[in-house]
């Protein structure tokens, strides 16, 4: 994945799901798609460290659910529409459930994914096309093509980021 073309100055800390204190000194911006296996790996492997950093007030996570045109990621696009951005803790819990059950819903039809989100995960569809469009426009302006893409200040990481690099 070529992250050298990404322009981090085109990324904002406003749009997205905010986890943690808004006055935290470090803003971590994460472009992810919940159907992507590399995003699941990133989410699960970084969760403990990030939870501690958020709890201690050092980091605010801004998670940007990035709808992708790639056929294999379209199921993630459907799931993204079940995240309630107005309730960050519940939204983070929903992301955990989505990643934990990715193997169950990941090959369903798009309609079946929506049903799975409602019946199996107990989620309600959130209609926020403006936010979805804003994340896509932001990613395009910054030349972000792949997920996961993690931006911390001027530093840009992909799925190969290590825990040591995050510290």
Regions found by a protein language model. Name each.
Residues 9-27:
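A short beta-strand-turn-helix
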Residues 2-10:
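N-terminal leader/targeting and pre-domain segments
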Residues 19-21, 68, 159:
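Generic structural "secondary-structure junction" signal
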Residues 1-3, 18, 38:
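Gram-positive cell-envelope targeting signals
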Residues 31, 42-50, 115-167:
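C-terminal cap of thioredoxin/glutaredoxin-like
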Residues 28, 36, 150:
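Conserved S/T- and glycine-rich ATP-binding loop of Class I adenylate-forming
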Residues 32-35, 40-114:
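Structural alpha/beta surface segment adjacent to cysteine/selenocysteine redox centers
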């Amino acid at each position: 994945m070529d992250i050298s073309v990404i322009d981090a100055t085109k990324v904002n800390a406003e749009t997205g799901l905010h986890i943690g204190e808004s006055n935290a000194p470090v803003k971590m911006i994460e472009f992810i798609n919940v159907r992507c296996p590399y995003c699941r790996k990133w989410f699960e492997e970084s969760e403990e460290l990030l939870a501690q950093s958020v709890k201690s007030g050092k980091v605010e996570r801004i998670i940007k659910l990035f709808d992708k045109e790639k056929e294999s990621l379209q199921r993630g696009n459907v799931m993204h529409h079940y995240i309630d951005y107005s309730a960050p803790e519940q939204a983070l819990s929903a992301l955990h459930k989505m990643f934990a059950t990715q193997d169950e819903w990941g090959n369903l039809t798009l309609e079946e994914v929506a049903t799975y989100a409602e019946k199996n995960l107990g989620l309600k569809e959130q209609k926020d096309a403006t936010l979805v469009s804003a994340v896509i426009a932001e990613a395009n302006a910054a030349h972000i093509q792949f997920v996961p893409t993690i931006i911390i200040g001027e530093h840009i990481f992909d799925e190969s980021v290590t825990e040591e690099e995050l510290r």
